[in-house]
């Protein structure tokens, strides 16, 4: 039986494609296992959503683009991670490795190369991340979500495959969504998502402008962990959650407009659902700028609007939401021109063919 190793972690985006592909691998009769960090979000997601999958943890060090003494310490963590990963791979003997990126993936890809295990890596963002730039030297192929990403990569190794969204994404139940929120279908619904960690600045501006927003919308506010404000409990046309997992598809089913960070996986899900979006990407003080690139690219395609976090004000928020509502039909029409390049099954078969071909 062909066996496939999966790796990737550090953020939700570095796990979600794996969560989509692993069930396909199992359905097709392949044996699978996962390699990730000991305490990363990937472990929590894999063990909670795919509890039957064997999970192996390895040492991992963060990859930084700036000078820091921590880089010296983390070199040794990465080296230990390579040894840990080699041990796992020698024991499991996979036929191929699929890597979604993130700092934990680098030692796994290096270890796989040392054992002559073919590796396919996947890049979700418009510009390649540091982990995938390093891993590319040891991989057979890299797949991209954005077609323009091919401009940053060697032609003989890079293939555009488009976004891979969850199979259950379009199965949300509107009735259940209205039940969860106690909203009704007489008024538009605005979903606000500040990412898993939340955004205090975005949360504050939403709450400060709640009365104005409620003139147009019923508001679902995903605040991030520890950022609920109990003084708003019971407020008409407003409901807040720290984080939603199992019921998110039901909430998306009733959403007319979304305010969100600009992680690639999330914004492609909004695109697949034809939900106009106002994107507020992580700034350069919190990231390498990948979300800014993603957001500007989506805005250039006519899928929504963008506000940079350092220019996020009450007035700018109102202006951009007004623009979205004025041009809603045109935005949705533009979204309808987007076609998914590969089904989940097609992408999985491509991985197998590319990895195992001579």
UniProtKB/Swiss-Prot annotation:
Q: Name one Pfam family in it.
A: Glyco_tran_28_C
Which residues bind UDP-N-acetyl-alpha-D-glucosamine per the record? 166, 196, 291
Give the reactions, separated by semicolons, that this protein catalyses: Mur2Ac(oyl-L-Ala-gamma-D-Glu-L-Lys-D-Ala-D-Ala)-di-trans,octa-cis-undecaprenyl diphosphate + UDP-N-acetyl-alpha-D-glucosamine = beta-D-GlcNAc-(1->4)-Mur2Ac(oyl-L-Ala-gamma-D-Glu-L-Lys-D-Ala-D-Ala)-di-trans,octa-cis-undecaprenyl diphosphate + UDP + H(+)
Q: What is its main location?
A: membrane
The question of whether Glycoprotein is a record keyword is answered with no
Any idea where this protein resides? Cell membrane
Q: What are the UniProt keywords, alphabetically?
A: Cell cycle, Cell division, Cell membrane, Cell shape, Cell wall biogenesis/degradation, Glycosyltransferase, Membrane, Peptidoglycan synthesis, Transferase
Q: In which pathway does it act?
A: Cell wall biogenesis; peptidoglycan biosynthesis
Top-rank taxon:
Bacteria
Enumerate the SUPFAM superfamilies for this protein: UDP-Glycosyltransferase/glycogen phosphorylase
**What GO molecular function terms would the record report?**
undecaprenyldiphospho-muramoylpentapeptide beta-N-acetylglucosaminyltransferase activity
GO BP field: carbohydrate metabolic process; cell division; cell wall organization; lipid glycosylation; peptidoglycan biosynthetic process; regulation of cell shape
Q: What is its EC number?
A: 2.4.1.227
Taken from the UniProt entry, a GO cellular component term is: plasma membrane
What is the recorded membrane topology of this protein? Answer: Peripheral membrane protein
Q: Which family does it belong to?
A: Belongs to the glycosyltransferase 28 family. MurG subfamily.
Stored PANTHER family = UDP-N-ACETYLGLUCOSAMINE--N-ACETYLMURAMYL-(PENTAPEPTIDE) PYROPHOSPHORYL-UNDECAPRENOL N-ACETYLGLUCOSAMINE TRANSFERASE, UDP-N-ACETYLGLUCOSAMINE--N-ACETYLMURAMYL-(PENTAPEPTIDE) PYROPHOSPHORYL-UNDECAPRENOL N-ACETYLGLUCOSAMINE TRANSFERASE 1
Its function, per the record, reads: Cell wall formation. Catalyzes the transfer of a GlcNAc subunit on undecaprenyl-pyrophosphoryl-MurNAc-pentapeptide (lipid intermediate I) to form undecaprenyl-pyrophosphoryl-MurNAc-(pentapeptide)GlcNAc (lipid intermediate II).
Which HAMAP family would you find in this protein's record? MurG
Q: Please identify the protein, giving its name as recorded.
A: UDP-N-acetylglucosamine--N-acetylmuramyl-(pentapeptide) pyrophosphoryl-undecaprenol N-acetylglucosamine transferase
């Amino acid at each position: 039986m062909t066996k496939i190793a999966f790796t990737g972690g550090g953020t939700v985006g570095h796990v979600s494609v794996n969560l989509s592909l692993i069930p396909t691998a199992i359905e097709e009769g392949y044996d699978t296992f996962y390699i990730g960090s000991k305490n990363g979000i990937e472990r929590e997601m894999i063990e909670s959503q795919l509890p039957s999958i064997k999970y192996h943890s390895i040492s991992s060090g963060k990859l930084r683009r700036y000078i820091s003494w921590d880089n010296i310490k983390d070199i040794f963590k990465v080296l230990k991670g390579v040894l840990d990963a080699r041990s796992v791979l020698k024991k499991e003997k996979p036929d191929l490795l699929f890597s979604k990126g993130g700092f934990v993936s680098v030692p796994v890809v290096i270890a796989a190369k040392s054992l002559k295990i073919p590796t396919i890596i996947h890049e979700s963002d418009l510009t390649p991340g540091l982990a995938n730039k390093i891993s590319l030297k040891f991989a057979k192929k890299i797949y991209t979500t954005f077609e323009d990403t091919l401009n940053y990569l060697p032609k003989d190794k890079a293939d555009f495959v488009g976004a891979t969204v969850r199979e259950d994404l379009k199965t949300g139940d509107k009735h259940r969504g209205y039940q969860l929120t106690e909203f009704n279908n007489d008024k538009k619904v605005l979903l606000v998502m500040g990412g898993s960690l939340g955004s205090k600045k975005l949360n504050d501006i939403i709450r400060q402008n709640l009365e104005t927003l409620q003139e147009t919308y019923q508001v679902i506010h995903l605040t991030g962990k520890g950022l609920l404000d109990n003084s708003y409990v019971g407020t008409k046309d407003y409901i807040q959650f720290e984080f939603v997992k199992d019921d998110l598809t039901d909430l998306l089913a009733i959403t007319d407009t979304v305010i969100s960070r600009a992680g690639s996986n999330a914004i492609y899900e909004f695109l697949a659902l034809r939900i106009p979006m106002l994107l507020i990407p992580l700034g350069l003080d919190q990231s390498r700028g990948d979300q800014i690139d993603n957001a500007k690219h989506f805005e250039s395609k006519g899928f929504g609007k963008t506000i940079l976090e350092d220019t996020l004000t009450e007035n700018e928020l109102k202006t951009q939401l007004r623009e979205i509502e004025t041009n809603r039909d045109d935005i949705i029409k533009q979204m309808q021109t987007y076609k998914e390049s590969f089904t989940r099954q097609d992408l999985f078969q491509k991985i197998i063919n590319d990895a195992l071909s001579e």
